[in-house]
Amino acid sequence: MEFSIANLQPKERASFALRALYEAAGCRKYHMGRFEEYGLYQENRSFLSSEQVITFTDLDGRLLALKPDVTLSIAKTAQPTPGETLCYYYHENVYRPSAESHTFKEISQMGLEMLGAVGEAQVQQAVCLAARSLDALGAEWVLEVSHMGYLLSLIHISEPTRPISIS
């Protein structure tokens, strides 16, 4: 049987499209294990959408957690040198409480992180990648940019392929 992207499920096609987009932009894939030391999440509770985290004691006695977030792990392990900008993308499962069912849910999440020397050019790249990501998914979309400085710099980068409205 010959491989064809057309035979993939929509989620798989989306993942391939976004991976190609991010790698073409120079981002590297970040992969982490399922578990992270609970202390990382305890120290950064205000960053998380919920303080509820699935924890367990590992065989060596460390308190571990099923990851509720990927950004914190990337920030902890990716250490850019002064002046360096690192760009990572990820496709990971995270574990978060569901308000509707009052249980934990496993959520497939794909995202992009820029760390280090992040200036105007990197912000422009990230926002453009966000728009291109939404476009690659094929549905109608609206990208809201809430910082006027970012918005003005985006207007100056190139001719938009979509109309830009400022309200």
Model-predicted segments: where are they?
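Extended, charged alpha-beta segments that form solvent-exposed binding/catalytic grooves
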Residues: 2-7, 13-14, 20-72, 76-158, ...
